[in-house]
Amino acid sequence: MQTRLTAILAAFLTAVALLAGCSKSEESTATDLPDAATLLQQSAETTRGESSVHLLLRTTGELEELPIHSLEGDLTNTPAVAAEGKTTVTVMGQKVEDMPFVVADGDLYAALFGDAISLIGPAADIYDVGAILDPERGLANVLSNFSDAKSVDREKVNDVETVKITGKVSADAVNRIAPQLAVQDAVGGTAWIADGGDHELVQVQLEPRDGVTVTMTLSDWGKPVTVTKPAA
């Protein structure tokens, strides 16, 4: 009987030791993350040199200043700013889903309420998509203006292994990429940066106020984008 108890006790202690070993290993993995400031700088440099991207933008919460619920499309700033895709927006108090849009020569064309695509007006009156890739106003500038940045985890986003970084983004950087938000203070920010290669930006999220987020998920960096301007 004593031998059996000894065997059970030994098995129990072995299991405890193994669990302790696993916990220690997980802790060491969690602390073995790249330096946040260095990774942000590397990603900012990469982003600053990019001229096209596939973008998925989503918002949560009440955001009257930016009436975009979601937007997905291709964007380029070479040779000029142009974009094409679909968006869900609130227009005149009515939610319009999956509305086709084109941005060309500074103008926004869209198919409102199922109509044929037509000229709406200056794109910047709704949202200046050209700001996203602008080296001084866009995503690169957002990455360069993180403070209190910390690498907190490794996560897979769009099948890309990323390092998740949290911190604050300066009000100036937020207002440059989205002037409609008109924030007064630094806001919560999270960036998911590719763990390898040129450390491309995979996703970024801004929290202009409690319960409100703007998330951009990015892919196909550098892929050629051709946008045809609709007939007037």
From Swiss-Prot:
Coiled coil: none
CDD domains, alphabetized: LppX-like
InterPro entries cross-referenced by the UniProt entry: LolA/LolB/LppX, LppX/LprAFG
Pfam hit, one: LppX_LprAFG
PTM: Modified by Lgt on Cys-22 with an S-linked diacylglyceral, signal peptide is removed by LspA, Cys-22 is further modifed with a fatty acid on its amino group by Lnt yielding a triacylated protein.
Lipid tethering residues (S-diacylglycerol cysteine): C22
Predominant subcellular localization, coarse grouping: membrane
PROSITE patterns per UniProt: PROKAR_LIPOPROTEIN
Residues of the signal peptide: 1-21
Protein name: Lipoarabinomannan carrier protein LprG
Protein species of origin: Mycolicibacterium hassiacum (strain DSM 44199 / CIP 105218 / JCM 12690 / 3849)
Gene name in the database record: lprG
